[in-house]
C-alpha cells in the first residue's frame, strides 16, 4: 500500500509539472514550413517569442488560458490536501477530498483543451493547412488522462 501511495504521489507531481510546462510553453501548434509555433500566450517565429496572438482578444482563448490555470491550481491543491490527509486522516478512511479536487482539475483540463481543439487546433488563423499539434497540446491530453486516473484512485484507496 505504501508503494502504491508513493507511486501515486510521484505521478501526481509529474502531472502537475507537465501541466505547468504545457500551459507556459508556446508550442501548442507548430508550422511545418517554418520554425514557428503558437501557444496560449504568444506567437514564436525563429525562436523569437515576441509576437502576440492574432486572436489574443477572443473570449475562447481567454477561457482556455483560465481553465488551464485553474487546472494547475486544483492539481496543486489536490496534492497539498493529499499530503495533509495522509498524515491527519484516521485509518480506513478514503481520500475523498483529494480525489474530488483532482477530478475538478481533470474537468478544467477537459474544458480548456476541448475549447482549444474546437476553435484553434485546425484553424487557418494559426498557420496554413501545413501545421500540426505541438508537444504542449499532446502533453495536456496526457495530463488529462493522468489526472482522471489519479482522481479515481484517490477516491478508491483507503488509508491503512
UniProtKB/Swiss-Prot annotation:
Chief subcellular location: membrane
A Gene Ontology biological process annotation? apoptotic process
PROSITE patterns documented for this protein: PMP22_1 (PS01221), PMP22_2 (PS01222)
Q: Answer whether the UniProt record assigns the keyword Metal-binding to this protein.
A: no
Topology in the membrane? Multi-pass membrane protein
Check the record and name the InterPro entries matching this protein.
Answer: EMP_1, PMP-22/EMP/MP20-like, PMP22/EMP/MP20/Claudin, PMP22_EMP_MP20
Q: Where in the cell is it found?
A: Membrane
Name the residues that span the membrane: 1-21, 67-87, 95-115, 137-157
The Gene Ontology CC terms held by the record are: plasma membrane
Glycosites = 35, 43, 128
Highest taxon in the source lineage: Eukaryota
Keyword vocabulary terms for this entry: Glycoprotein, Membrane, Transmembrane, Transmembrane helix
Give the Pfam families listed for this entry: PMP22_Claudin
Q: According to its UniProt record, which protein family does this protein belong to? A: Belongs to the PMP-22/EMP/MP20 family.
Q: What is this protein called?
A: Epithelial membrane protein 1
